[in-house]
Amino acid sequence: MRKLTLALLLGTCAVLTACSSGQTASSETAAAVTEAASETASAENAGSNAEEEAAAETSEGTQVEGAEGQIPHTEVEIKYPAIIEVNEDVYANEPYKIAYANWNDENSISIIVRDSVLDACKYYGVECMVFDNKQDPNQAMTNCETAIQAGVDYYLNFNQDESINAAIAERLEQEGIPLISIQTKARDGIDPEYHIDNYKFGTLCGDLMVEEAAERWPGEQPILFVAGHPESGVNFIQRAEGCKDSVLSAMPETEVFEISTEGDPEVTRQRTTDFLTAHPEGKIMMWCHIDQNTMGMLAAVTAAGRLDDVIITSCGANPVIFEELKKEDSPVLGTVAQFSERFGWDLLPMAIEQLNDGTKPPLETVPPLDIITRDNLYTYYPDA
């Protein structure tokens, strides 16, 4: 892996955002896409024109050439070199049009994934058409139809409804457009899926709490408080199960209590407060499914004066929790990172190789996880 510096290849990535139901590409937008594709083709053949060569030399950053006829790489700054691995051996044979349908443009994790896809598209010299699924099945289906009408070559779909994913996959197959489903499968055993190990997401948290509880509270029998979000589907259920199983395998007598956060930090705070009121004594291991809600949990613990009685693990590695990780006296031990920053860099080489020569991605690709603690925070996030 090498550090790359940012330079936008002129016209390589046309970003279109489809946000409302029934949205279709306007003639003006289509013209912009056509113009961008033309510019990309011109940049690809710049070696044959001395004037274009001079322009390339004076542009910000440099291009890395592949074989004759392939789209050159544009160097892009990699902000998190300990997280992102750039496949420098893959080159696009053409300026393909990649559609990326985001889970929800208002979700912090989704935004990171979207930006990683855009950066990877810039690097590989392909166009990117961006959609927002809005966590809405109907919108996800509409986005698929719009992408088909726009003539995309590949579809990257981040959506957590399996039935809609399957319908999208079938519709794309009718048009000969390949797909990778992100985080949640489409058609089992048919469509490639890129997803984290949700069960391991929970076990990493449980393992850390078991270790810390034994060291911090020798001879004590702490209870386990699990703040999950089962309404959001199997991925979140698996995370909670992983945490519980990890703790119970090491401490089988542990009493377990569960709530739903309903995906809301304030609900998390209030239900944690109620739990602490009902359990005014003893040591507690706490787990929460996402960092933003963990902050609500922490607020309840602080208000109750129970900081010395509680240890907390979380999920997401969102910057909102980094300040707590830096504190030696914080009850927050760690947060599991799924490294959303690398998703696009993993996905684009698979898509490009399939478009180049028909090499289909594996049915399952699982990126690495790690739990971010005070000890390794700056290794992964130097600017935290």
Provide a role label for each language-model segment.
Residues 102-104, 117, 205-253, 258, ...:
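An alpha-beta-alpha
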Residues 75-85, 91-92, 140, 193-222, ...:
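Hydrophobic alpha-helical segments within soluble ligand-binding/sensing domains
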Residues 162-200, 318-327, 381:
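Flexible loop/hinge segments that line or gate small-molecule binding clefts
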Residues 15-18:
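C-terminal motif of bacterial Sec signal peptides marking the signal peptidase cleavage site
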Residues 60-96, 227-228, 246-247, 339-384:
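Hinge/cleft segment of the Venus flytrap/periplasmic-binding protein
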Residues 20-23:
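Bacterial signal peptide processing site
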Residues 101-114, 130-139, 161, 183, ...:
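Hinge/beta->alpha junction and helix N-cap segments in small-molecule ligand-binding domains
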Residues 154-174, 243, 261-324:
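Hydrophobic alpha-helical
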